[in-house]
């Protein structure tokens, strides 16, 4: 039974790669709460995964989006303007780093990987927010996904930590810029979750074990945990919340060490 927190709202969901993606879990719960959704995919390979998921929950709009290509972004928002006219919320769910550099030393990060990671993981939020602003006629909510590696050193997270730190700072600056139009911008800092992207991080299984052992709730974060937080941030329940980093990590971030 749905409570309809997003009834009558339209939302753009980016970052779905497969049925284990955090963006997919968020989309499922948003749909259950009454939202009409628009999905994007990054490539033809991902199109074959995303379109069946869209069909599964009755999402009628699926478009290609390459955030490194300004024309791809403008085409997407032109389509949204034509079909919807306006919309209410945006999930920024993409991130990138060369998997070969998600192990070893951060100091060995290549310039190409640094540029690509910051562009796709952080600058894309600015680009999408700028385009969304023009179509959020009655205000709106923009949510992105981050991780504790933006604040503290997480072994092997490397350049992604830098990208997420820039992303979190961007959330605060965007919230300030867009607030006058009643557009809220927030980030969800989720605990480590096994996804296609996280599988590239070296020794990820150890990260999961450490998180569960340290977190006050003594478990790992689930996609559904993050989905619930996203629905809250998309909905009018959070109408006074902007510029925040909202932790959904079973309390891991409050701990200084494991219990002795």
Swiss-Prot record:
A Pfam family that the UniProt record links to this protein: adh_short_C2
Sequence positions that bind substrate: 97
Entry-linked Gene3D superfamilies: Enoyl acyl carrier protein reductase, NAD(P)-binding Rossmann-like Domain
Positions with a binding annotation for NAD(+): 15, 21-22, 42, 66-67, 94, 164, 193-197
InterPro entries per record: Enoyl-ACP_Rdtase_NADH, NAD(P)-bd_dom_sf, SDR_fam
Keyword Methyltransferase carried by entry: no
Top-level taxon of origin: Bacteria
Catalytic activity: a 2,3-saturated acyl-[ACP] + NAD(+) = a (2E)-enoyl-[ACP] + NADH + H(+)
GO molecular function, one term: enoyl-[acyl-carrier-protein] reductase (NADH) activity
Similarity comment text for this entry: Belongs to the short-chain dehydrogenases/reductases (SDR) family. FabI subfamily.
Subunit structure: Homotetramer.
Function, as annotated: Catalyzes the reduction of a carbon-carbon double bond in an enoyl moiety that is covalently linked to an acyl carrier protein (ACP). Involved in the elongation cycle of fatty acid which are used in the lipid metabolism.
Record protein name field: Enoyl-[acyl-carrier-protein] reductase [NADH] FabI
Species per Swiss-Prot/TrEMBL record: Rickettsia felis (strain ATCC VR-1525 / URRWXCal2) (Rickettsia azadi)
Gene expressing this chain: fabI
């Amino acid at each position: 039974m749905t409570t309809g927190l997003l009834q009558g709202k339209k939302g753009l969901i980016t970052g779905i790669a497969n049925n284990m993606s955090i963006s997919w879990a968020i989309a499922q719960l948003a749909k259950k709460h009454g939202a009409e959704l628009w999905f994007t995919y990054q490539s033809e390979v991902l199109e074959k995964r995303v379109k069946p998921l869209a069909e599964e929950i009755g999402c009628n709009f699926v478009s290609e989006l390459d955030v490194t290509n300004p024309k791809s972004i403008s085409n997407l928002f032109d389509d949204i303007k034509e079909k919807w006219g306006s919309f209410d919320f945006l999930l920024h769910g993409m991130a990138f780093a060369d998997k070969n550099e998600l192990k070893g030393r951060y100091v060995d990060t290549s310039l190409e990987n640094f540029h690509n990671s910051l562009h796709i993981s952080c600058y894309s939020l600015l680009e999408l927010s700028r385009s969304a602003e023009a179509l959020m006629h009655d205000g709106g909510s923009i949510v992105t996904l981050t991780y504790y590696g933006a604040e503290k050193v997480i072994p092997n997270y490397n350049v992604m930590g830098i990208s997420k730190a820039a992303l979190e700072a961007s959330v605060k600056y965007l919230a300030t810029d867009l607030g006058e139009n009643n557009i809220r911008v927030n980030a969800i800092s989720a605990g480590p979750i096994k996804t296609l992207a996280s599988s590239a991080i070296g020794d990820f299984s150890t990260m999961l074990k450490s998180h569960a052992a340290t977190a006050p709730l003594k478990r790992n974060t689930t996609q559904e945990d993050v989905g619930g937080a996203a629905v809250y941030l998309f909905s009018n329940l959070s109408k006074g919340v902007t510029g925040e980093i909202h932790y959904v990590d079973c309390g891991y971030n409050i701990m200084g060490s494991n219990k002795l």
